[in-house]
Swiss-Prot record:
It comes from Sminthopsis macroura (Stripe-faced dunnart). It comes from the Eukaryota. GO terms for molecular function: hormone activity; thyroid hormone binding. InterPro entries: Thyroxine_BS, Transthyretin/HIU_hydrolase, Transthyretin/HIU_hydrolase_d, Transthyretin/HIU_hydrolase_sf, Transthyretin_CS. Thyroid hormone-binding protein. Probably transports thyroxine from the bloodstream to the brain. It is found in: Secreted. Keywords: Gamma-carboxyglutamic acid, Hormone, Secreted, Signal, Sulfation, Thyroid hormone, Transport. Highly expressed in the choroid plexus. Sulfonation of the reactive cysteine Cys-32 enhances the stability of the native conformation of TTR, avoiding misassembly of the protein leading to amyloid formation. This is Transthyretin. The modification Sulfocysteine is found at residue 32. Homotetramer. Dimer of dimers. In the homotetramer, subunits assemble around a central channel that can accommodate two ligand molecules. Interacts with RBP4.
Amino acid sequence: MAFHSLLLLCLAGLVFLSEAGPVAHGAEDSKCPLMVKVLDSVRGSPAVNVDVKVFKKTEEQTWELFASGKTNNNGEIHELTSDDQFGEGLYKVEFDTVSYWKTFGISPFHEYADVVFTANDAGHRHYTIAAQLSPFSFSTTAVVSNPKD
């Protein structure tokens, strides 16, 4: 049983590493400063139809909804915002994990998986936030790159 779990985890990791990288900025996605990628560790596939909300921290120290979307068949969301709108600040990406797992009849431990990060404090950048989900754990990583003209 432990070997089977380890094998599934390794396979999911391979999928994560092979598909989680950003689309080459400067190609079709050059105006996409924030991209989200979600993978299902249990099934070893992209997590389709995951609701994602992006919040920005206000001067009053509250979270204001900034953008939202649902992952596509590749487990990705592009065009959440534009270069002009995505300014310096503190952002929170919220993955609605409970709704995703309940579609498969699974009652997960986490209601949401949140990633809080500071954006564009060292100049304009493009961000890919990748999340790997399972019912009782999640892992996130980010790829930060300079945009190409």
